[in-house]
C-alpha cells in the first residue's frame, strides 16, 4: 500500500473508540457486566483474525510442508503433571490483606519503578513524552501513590531502578519479595502493605465425566497434543527427521490480573510449530536463504548488564558468533520476522529478546521472544524456544512408550557400554512384586550412573536402587553391571524440538495499533492501513447515489468480485460518498470502487486507494484485474497509477 505519514501522536483513547464503534472487539458478556480477560471479536475483528491465520498457514504450514493437526482442548491431569505444568506453570502473586486485591508481583514492581522514574524525569525538567502510553488501570494506581509524584531520585537509585527493569523477568518469588521490601512497594491505590509473593498456577481445572473422578484442565498450550502424537506423525512422515507439526487453536490461562485489552487475556488463539530435529545435527537446510537477514537482537548478556541496547546484525553472523545457538533456531527467527513484516507490523518496533535463565520455561534450554512495541510498551508476541528433548522424554518415561526415532546406520558400529543383567533365579524371589520396577530403574540409568554403580558393586558388594522414593538394596549376586561390546545397525534417539509459538491475539492487537493513524487535515478521521492481504474487507462498492439505475450494475460487480474470492461490501446509504469512504477507511478497507453515471454509459469504474485517496479509472474488467493483482500482492497501486493514470475527482 501507499506509504503514510503518521504525524499525529498515537492517541489510544481515540483508537479504542474506533475499535468499539466499528466492533473489532468487545468485552464478553458485556450486558451482564463482563468478565475481565474475556473478549468477543465482531465482524471486522473475526475477518481480520481469519485472514491472519490464513497467512500464517501459507507462510509456515504450506511453505515448510508442516503436518497440521487439531487436538483436544481438554487435557487429563496426568499429561500436564508429567509435562511439568501442574507444578511449574505459575506466576507470582501478592495479596493486599486489607482489601483482598490481588497483584501479579513482577508487573507491580515494574509499574511502580517505571512511574517513579517518570516522576524523577518530571522533577528534573526532562521530557518523558517518549514513554509508551500507560493503560488506564496503571494510571489509576499510579496517581494515588505519593512517592511517584514529581520527586527527584538520586542518581544511584535511578541506576538501580533501570538495572532492575532491564531484567525484571529474571526474578523469582523470593527476589521479587526482597525488591518490594527494599523499595517499599505497596498497593498503589491504598498504600497498604502486601503479603509475600506466592505462586499461583495458571491452568483452569475441570472434571472430565459425570463421576468427577477424572481431573483435567483446559490446555494452557497446544503443544502437548502434538508431542503425544509424535509416533503417528513420524510414521506419517515415513520415519524421516527433521519434520515439523503445526496447530492453530484456543488455549486458556487463568491470569492473575488480566489487563491491556487483548494483550493479557484468559482465553486466546495460539499457533504453534513443533520442529523435530536430530540433537546431533541442528543445521537447517534452508538457512542460507535467510542468513543475510538483519534482526534486532537483545541478548541475555546485555540484559544482565542492566541495559536494553539493541544489537542489529544478520542472523547468519549471530549464529556464527554463538549469540543464537543453531541454524534451525536462527532460521525460524528469520521466518518469524518475515511473517510479521508480511502482515503489516512496523519492523522498526520489533526486537528478539533472549530469555533470562530464571524466566525460561521449565521445558526450555534457550528461548528468544519476538517482542513488538506498542502503546503498552514491549509485548511478547512470539516465542521461539529450543525445548531440547524434554517433552518426548518425560512422556515416554511416564507411559513406558518409546517416543524415539530409529535410523538405519550407513555402516554397522561396534559400541562399548555398560549393561545391567539380573540373576533371574534369585532376583524375582528376592524382590517379588517389586522386581520389575527395580530392574527397570537400573536399566534406565544413564551411562554415567551405570559406571558409578558398577564400581560401587565391586567395592561394596551391593548398591542402593531408589524406586518411587523407596530404597532397595541389591547385592552383587543378584545383578551384574559390566561393559560389553555389541554391534549396532540402528541408531535410536529422542529428537530435540524447536518451537515457534505465536500469540495470535497479541499480534492482532499490535497490528491494529501499528495500522492506525489519522488524516492530517482532520484528526477525527481515523484510518487503519492494513495490507490488502489481511484487510477484513478488500473492496468497498459505492454507487454515486441511490439512483435505481445503479443497482443492477452494483449487484453484478459485487458478484464478480465474490467469484474471484474478493470480499466486498456495498454501501448504498444516503451518506455522501466522502463519508462512506471515511467510515470504511476506519474498517481498513484498502480499495473503493465507485459506480456513477459514466459507468452506465461505457462500463468504466473508479478505483480509489485508501491511504493516498488517489483514484484511477478504467474498464470494469481492467480495474477488477488490477484489484485482484493488488490483493494478491503481485502489484501495487503505483503500478495501477502508471497503467491508468490518476483520475481527478472532487467527490471527497
UniProtKB/Swiss-Prot annotation:
It catalyses: tRNA(Gly) + glycine + ATP = glycyl-tRNA(Gly) + AMP + diphosphate; 2 ATP + H(+) = P(1),P(4)-bis(5'-adenosyl) tetraphosphate + diphosphate. SUPFAM superfamilies: Class II aaRS ABD-related, Class II aaRS and biotin synthetases. GO terms for biological process: cytoplasmic translation; diadenosine tetraphosphate biosynthetic process; glycyl-tRNA aminoacylation; mitochondrial glycyl-tRNA aminoacylation. Keywords: Aminoacyl-tRNA synthetase, ATP-binding, Cytoplasm, Ligase, Nucleotide-binding, Protein biosynthesis, Transferase. PROSITE patterns: AA_TRNA_LIGASE_II (PS50862). InterPro entries: aa-tRNA-synth_II, aa-tRNA-synth_II/BPL/LPL, Anticodon-bd, Anticodon-bd_dom_sf, Gly-tRNA_synthase/POLG2, GlyRS-like_core, tRNA-synt_gly. Homodimer. Belongs to the class-II aminoacyl-tRNA synthetase family. Catalyzes the ATP-dependent ligation of glycine to the 3'-end of its cognate tRNA, via the formation of an aminoacyl-adenylate intermediate (Gly-AMP). Also produces diadenosine tetraphosphate (Ap4A), a universal pleiotropic signaling molecule needed for cell regulation pathways, by direct condensation of 2 ATPs. Thereby, may play a special role in Ap4A homeostasis. This is Putative glycine--tRNA ligase. It comes from Schizosaccharomyces pombe (strain 972 / ATCC 24843) (Fission yeast). The gene is grs1.
